[in-house]
């Protein structure tokens, strides 16, 4: 199954749980793409020892998951894109939604 996950929260626990879910889906042999938008592009900065968002994202990428992030949202926060938060577009999000069998939002 193809699963799209859209994360627009910068709450550490919410981002952490969304990424844990993404990792769980990969372990079920699903194809998973995560798109960060709005406050969600801040996920690397909001992680804590208890809710380590970067660790979950790293595990996700190393397991074959794909991460996308709204370029406009990144620029609005004066951030730069990176491997863990690559600059993407609304067209990318559209394609994820269009191609996914299921879309989950956080």
Each model region followed by its residue ranges:
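Histidine-anchored nucleotide/phosphate-binding helix
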Residues: 14-27
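Short beta-alpha junction loops
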Residues: 38-41, 74
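Short, glycine-rich nucleotide/cofactor-binding loops
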Residues: 3-16, 41-48
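Short, well-ordered alpha-helix to beta-strand connector turns
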Residues: 29, 64, 100-101
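Short internal beta-strands
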Residues: 22, 32-37, 67-71
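C-terminal structural segments of small proteins and small subunits
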Residues: 75-106
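Charged helix-capping and loop-helix junction motifs
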Residues: 20, 49-54, 86-89
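A glycine-rich helix N-cap at a beta->alpha junction
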Residues: 50-76
